[in-house]
C-alpha cells in the first residue's frame, strides 16, 4: 500500500460513518506508516479526538474507537507527525478563536514555517485571549502564537503582561527577551506548565524547557544576567543594605525564572555559575537574623529542584552546605529530598561529575557522592581514556581514595580486556590483577568500571576472594554485585515475568522506591525509573500513593528506550546486558524489601505500636511467623543466593572445620538454622527468637563483611553468636 493510499484509508476511518456502532472494518497494516503519512491524516485524527471523543464523549462511535486505537499505535511506534502546508491549513481551520492550547500542541508538528494563509489562521486563534481574559501565566503561549502568526511587534503584548506581572521584576525582564528567542525556545516555554517546573520524581514526564533554552544564545545571556542580579540582591539582603522580610525576597513567579536560569546554566556547565550557586542557594535558605525563617521559600525550593534535575559538583555541594545551615524546618525537609536524586543524576553526567575530584578533599561525604555518581556508570555509558582516568581518579586526592578500592576493566585497541585494581603506595601506582600480580595496560586503552556480568565465573570468584582476603570494603558493591540475565522467552519481548507474583507491602515498597529514585506511575499502579536511555516500569496490583498501607501482587517489568522525546517499548534482548542487569537488580531490591520483612526488634516494635490490644498484638505476631514460614519455603531469589555465597566466604574456616554447614536455604550450626532469605531462626525445626548479645569485650572477633546489608549483618551476627 502506498503512503497516499494509507493516509486516505486512515482519513476514511476517522471521518466516515458506519451502519453499525460496533463496526471495526478490516485490520490496517501500519508497518509502512511514517511521519509524513501520519501528518496527512493528522487533521482527521485531531478532529475525531476533539469533536467526537472530548465534546460528545461518544464511546460507541466507531470513529472514536478507531481514533483511540490509532493513537495507541502511534505512541507505541514513537511517531511524531510532520504536517505539510495543506494539512496544516485544514488542521488549524478547525480550531476556534482562543483555542491556544490546541494550537500550541500542534505547532511543533509543522514541517515548515507557516504560509501567509496559515499565519492568518493563527492570528485568528491568537486574537482572543485564552479563556477570555489576559492571564499572566499565559504569556509564553501568547508570544509563541504571535511569532508563528508573523507578528513581530510584541509591544502591546509586553505592556499587558508587564502590568499583570508588576510585582515580579524577573518575569517582566524575561518578557523583554522573549522576542529575541527562536521558535523552538518559544514552543518549549509554551509547552511547560505555565513556566512552572518540578522534577520527574513529582511529575511524571514533565518536560523541562531549559534543555531547549540552553541552545538559544539570547536566553543564555539572560540566564547569566538573571543569576548575577539574583545573587547581588541576596548579598545585599544579608549585608543589611535591604530590610529583611521573611519570604518576601522573590515572588513565586520570579523564583521560577531564576531557577530556570540556573538549570540552563547547569545544563551548559557554565563556569560563571560555579561561584554563584553556593551563596545564592544558602542565601535564600537562611535569614540574615537568628530567625527560623527564610528570605524566599519559593526560590529555595525551586533551586533545590534545579539542582536535583541538572546537577553540577558545585551545585550539589551548595545543596549540602544549605542543608547544614538552614533553620526553616519546611525548607530543610524539602531540600533533603533533593540531595540523593541530585547525586544520582550527577552520575549521569560523568565527565561533569569527575570535576569534583580535582579540588575536593577526600572526606567521607565527598567519597560517598563520588561513589553514587560512579555507580551510575553501570547503566550510563562511561569510559575514560587512560590519561583522563589517571588525572581525574588515580592522581586526584578524592579520586585516589575511590579508585584504589574498585576493580577496573581496560579494553585495548585490539578488543582485548584486562581487569585490575590500582595499588597506590606512597604516590607510586602499580596495577594488579586478581591474583595480586603486577600488570600493564596500553596507553590507548579505554577504562571503565568492572562489572561481574562482563566476565566468567572463575574471574568473578577470583576477585571476590581477593576482596575478602584483603578485607577491603568497596565504596560501591562490585565484586559481590548481583547480576541478572533475561530468560530466552524474555529476550524477544519488552516485558519480563522475572519478578511477577510476589505479595508486596506498599509502605516499605514506596519507602525504598523513593530512596532509590523511582516515581509513582501516572496511573498509580506501578513505579517508573530511568536508567540512562532505558526506562523501567514495574507494575503492582495495588494503588500506590504516598502513605498507602495496602498490599499488592507484583506484575511484569516493562522496559522502553528513548526515541527522540518519546519512550518506545524495546525487546529486552536489544538492551545492553549490563543495563538490563542493573534494572533487574533495582527491581529485585524493591521486591526483597517489600516482600521479605526484616525479622528484628525494630520491625516487631513498629507492628506492636499499631495497637495496644493484646489479642491484636498476638494476631500480628502470629501473622508475622506465618508469613516468614511461607517465605522460607520459597526458592531463594538472586539477592538471597548472593547472600548465601557471601556467607560461605565469610565463614570459610568454620565450614572447613565442620562447625557450620550451608545447604540450599539455610546456614546450620548444630541444631540451629538461619534462613538466608528471611533471617528466620529455628532450633530443631521450631521457630525461635534469637537474642543477639553485644560483644562481651572489644577482643571478641567480629566477622568482616564485604558490603553493608542489614539482613546479611543480622544473619552473620546470629551465626557468630551461635558459634560462641
What are these regions, as identified by a protein language model?
Residues 1-311, 316, 323-724:
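Non-catalytic terminal/accessory regions
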